[in-house]
Amino acid sequence: YKEVPGIQFTIMSTYNFLSMTSYIPFLKDVLDIKLEYHRWDDHRTPMLLDIPYLRFPNHQAIFIMEPEQLQMIYDQVTFMYQNLEYKNWYGSANRGFFEHEADKLKRIYNIAKDNVVTEVTENNRRNFVKFVDEHDKRRGTNFLATFPEYGEVYYKWKNM
């Protein structure tokens, strides 16, 4: 924004199973940028956050999550609402998340909250394990070293 005054851009962050555990740090980074570059006296919005959710492939969508993981999404939505801009006051207008941005993550929370685990879910969980195992094999990577926070569900699903 300093080098190209007046630039406006949108971050499109497709929410998926693997983004769940790191979304608060991501939101903090976005908030820092918003606080630095958004100004109350400027009608332009240098940066917007769009949060669609991944639907396909099914084995990477949030619908494979364990019920206790829903709390992560709840905490992320809460973080966004706690850091909303307040448009009716000079010092806080255009600074922070916009309500429509937080509403997008809230929608994801509500969809996930109403999700029912079925045999299709179980199959997608098994496919997730197959996917990361095959990815590690082909690319020489280590899923559990990269995402140690998923170790418990990985082993649970691997042994289904």
What residues fall within each predicted segment?
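Conserved C-terminal portion of the radical SAM core fold
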Residues: Y1-Y155
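Sequence context surrounding c-type heme c attachment/ligation sites in exported
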Residues: M160
